[in-house]
Amino acid sequence: MPELLKQRVETCYQQAETFFKRPFPRPQVSFKLRGQKAGVAHLHENLLRFNLQLYRENQDDFLRQTVAHEVAHLVAHQLFGDKIQAHGEEWQLIMRGVYELPPNRCHNYEVQRRVATRYIYRCPCPESDFPFTAQRHKLVRQGRRYLCRRCREILVYSGETRVE
């Protein structure tokens, strides 16, 4: 686990404990998060998940804003319970009052789109390319059939792939 991020989580908790004059249980921290989300707080599991790739690409802002954002969710839940809104007044109070940060809901990190292989299926219709995902292609190999909406013929794998 990146040591700076672990230290930042601890610093955020120490700030919250000083501000609210009470202890908070420390969460488990995981880097099993991919895609567009920078971080996720699992309230009932006391778990923080972070996107390691976005952390590496945006380290300074990630440590300052994203870590505090996710810790604030756990602190708000432990202080105010289940009935609060995710980015409601209580969470905003913690972001502004404890961490002195803007309560931004979303990051603006550039996210790399995943390279996807498409499997090209065809029917007798002219210009009928049907790019299937790997998941749909696997379903066809397992026996599922897909029909063209125009000619009602079964789509057949052409043997071609395309990277998007």
UniProtKB/Swiss-Prot annotation:
Transmembrane segments: none annotated. InterPro entries: SprT-like_domain, Uncharacterised_SprT. Binds 1 zinc ion. The keyword Zinc applies. Zn(2+) binds at H69, H73. Residues 14-156 form the SprT-like domain. The active site is at E70. Keywords: Cytoplasm, Metal-binding, Zinc. GO terms for cellular component: cytoplasm. Its cofactor is Zn(2+). It is found in: Cytoplasm. Disulfide bonds: none annotated. One of its GO terms (biological process) is response to stress. Signal peptide: none annotated. GO terms for molecular function: zinc ion binding. HAMAP family: SprT. Belongs to the SprT family. This is Protein SprT. It comes from Pseudomonas entomophila (strain L48).
